[in-house]
Curated annotation (Swiss-Prot):
Domain of life of the source: Bacteria
Catalytic activity: beta-D-fructose 1,6-bisphosphate + H2O = beta-D-fructose 6-phosphate + phosphate
Comment on bound cofactor: Binds 2 magnesium ions per subunit.
Major location (coarse): cytoplasm
Necessary cofactors: Mg(2+)
Gene name as annotated: fbp
Record-listed Mg(2+) 2 binding positions: 96, 99, 232
Phylogenetic lineage: Bacteria, Pseudomonadati, Campylobacterota, Epsilonproteobacteria, Campylobacterales
A molecular function GO annotation: magnesium ion binding
Organism: Helicobacter pylori (strain HPAG1)
Ligand binding (Mg(2+) 1): 78, 96, 98
InterPro entries according to UniProt: FBPase_C_dom (IPR044015), FBPase_class-1 (IPR000146), FBPase_N (IPR033391), SBPase (IPR023079)
Protein name, UniProt field: Fructose-1,6-bisphosphatase class 1
Length: 290
């Protein structure tokens, strides 16, 4: 893989993790392709969800590999109650081993989300993030100074493009139970569809955000507090912001940056809006004051 795009203080750890992922893609594919990979276990993870077999197998594989990196001090999976910590190292990893596992049996796009933190698990300490999506193609998205898209081919990740969101998109991925949507959100969505926006919600957050990114604009929303800050929300928020979009939530009707949220507990959840600038403006107009 060509690492010429990665510069700055945190470039080396990003390169190390990508190199690790590049070597591990085939093993991950094997895990996902097993006939019973989508079968539910009888366990319950720290977030109260029932993991599928592929969740646990990928988690074990990733944890072992992340801990093998000398500069990693702590590794934290959403499947675990607390982080696994070493004596040495500078960086901390929080990851969702298999985002979208609930739709895997339908053969929808799933992925691994990774946040790289420094010193402590806080939004302000998130220095880079990335995800890998598994479908008929395998792609990697990396946020450091900018956002870079890669495709896996012949055992390597190949650079495709630098992602920059346009001011306005044409797709909407609105997750959650619509009967619980606020009046403001319902009006915003009605306005988008009146402008011929297309609904592109799959039930896999990483897939839906990936769609917004490769289409260069649009909006992903999940207004209920269901998504985990450290493992899903913060890493994808960083990618959206580095792509010149906006990542936010509403606190008593006031729009605020997701990456300025505090974290009171490891598995704390948040509402989440990820959008290009025009869609962010429309959402604020309708949800302000609610």
């Amino acid at each position: 893989m060509d690492y010429k795009h990665f510069k700055g203080k945190h470039a080396n750890i990003v390169i190390e993790i990508i190199s690790l992922l590049e070597k591990g893609v085939k093993k991950a594919q094997e895990i996902l392709e097993k006939p019973d990979a989508g079968s539910y276990t009888k366990l319950e993870n720290s977030s109260g969800d029932t993991p599928i077999k592929a969740d646990l197998a990928l988690d074990k594989f990733l944890e072992e590999n992340f801990l093998s990196l000398e500069n990693i001090k702590s590794v934290f999976s959403e499947e675990k109650e607390t982080p696994v910590t070493k004596e040495n190292g500078s960086y901390l990893i929080a990851y969702d081993p298999l985002d979208g596992s609930s739709v895997m049996e339908a053969n929808f796009l799933v992925g691994t989300i990774i946040g790289i933190y420094e010193k402590d698990y806080k939004a302000q300490n998130l220095v880079a993030s990335l995800y890998v999506v598994f479908g008929h193609k395998i792609e990697l998205m990396v946020a450091l100074e900018e956002v870079y898209r890669y495709a896996f081919y012949q055992n390597k990740f190949h650079f495709i493009e630098t992602i920059v969101l346009e001011n306005k998109g044409k797709i909407v991925a609105s997750g959650g139970n619509q009967k619980d949507f606020s009046l403001g959100l319902k009006k915003a969505l009605e306005g988008f569809f009146a402008e011929n926006y297309r609904l592109r919600y799959s039930g896999s957050m990483v897939a839906d955000v990936h769609h917004v990114l490769i289409k260069k604009g649009g909006m992903f929303s999940y207004p209920q507090k269901k998504l985990r800050k450290l493992f899903e929300v913060f890493p994808l928020a960083l990618i959206i912001e580095k792509a010149k979009g906006e990542a936010f939530y509403f606190d008593k009707g006031v729009k605020k940056r997701l990456l300025e949220q505090s974290v009171e507990s490891y598995h704390e959840k948040s509402e989440c809006y990820l959008a290009s600038p025009h869609e962010a403006q429309i959402l604020e107009k309708h949800l302000k004051g609610e």
